[in-house]
Amino acid sequence: MSATNSTPPANTFPTPINDRYFEDYVPGAVHRFGEMRVTEQEIVEFARLYDPQSFHVDAEAARASLFGGLIASGWQVTSKLMRLFVDNYIDKRTALGSPGLDEIRWLKPVRPGDTLTAWVECAAKVPSKSKPDIGVIHEHWGATNQKGELV
């Protein structure tokens, strides 16, 4: 997906969530998997527990920061995306875990009141050499705000 106005169409995965298997994932296919609105209360509560930097927990200090106002922790945004992914995209019966993440980038600040649209692109799929009935799906995730900007 490009870095400008990148919100894909509504969830277009042709296979229902409870029927998805390795062969159903098509490299290059992009699917939306949910929306979330971010509130000031959520930003502050998450940050107090996990990322207590002033621009996440103190609106006044945040106004004086380079961000010019309160912003969500990137870890909060990533966590919320993961929740949407689990609830709306992966098949809980066939998913076998993840070998890890290669890269995370937070491109624009997420602010109170933003509505984020989450999407996933199947970048590649690699059959297991030792277990031919399973494989690894490489994906790119992202989210756009209500302006269509990648965050």
Model-based region annotation:
Residues 1-27, 106-115, 119-151:
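HotDog/MaoC-like acyl-thioester-processing domains
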Residues 2-100:
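Hot-dog-fold acyl-thioester-processing enzymes
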